[in-house]
Swiss-Prot record:
It comes from Pinus thunbergii. GO terms for biological process: photosynthesis. This is Photosystem I assembly protein Ycf3. It is a peripheral membrane protein. TPR repeats lie at residues 35-68, 72-105, 120-153. The keyword Repeat applies.
Amino acid sequence: MPRSQRNDNFIDKTFTIVADILLRIIPMAPGEKEAFTYYRDGMSAQSEGEYAEALQNYYEAMRLETDPYDRSYILYNIGLVHTSNGEHTKALEYYFQALERNPSLPQALNNTALICHYRGEQAIRQGDPETAEAWFDQAAEYWEQAIALAPGNYIEAQNWLKITGRFGE
């Protein structure tokens, strides 16, 4: 049984109902509908922490989806799963692929910045301030791009940029 038919979460059920209505009324090719169904099931599995199942659904959605913009969101969500699993290198690969297809994806830029910042903190703990600064500078670049795309978002990142003197460098 598809995951979308066994949701217990109210928000997931609501999303599923709205998505099913849209699938019926918006004209799209059968492959696109099937890709969206896998994407929706992947999001549902991901929200429940079922990451292996989410990845299976996202990979199937990628196989079927042809639109680069839609593929960017699938790739972004695959990156989220890898981030949740602590697989930051893999996550970055998927965030970069998402940004190649959709450069206006501030959440992918933000998550890339978060990983760079995390790596900077790791370098500090390991006693390597030069490497830490390089990671923090990279984080700043990605956050500035994300903030440029979504000025009202990422307030904590904006504060960090100001406090560390990296805002607008």
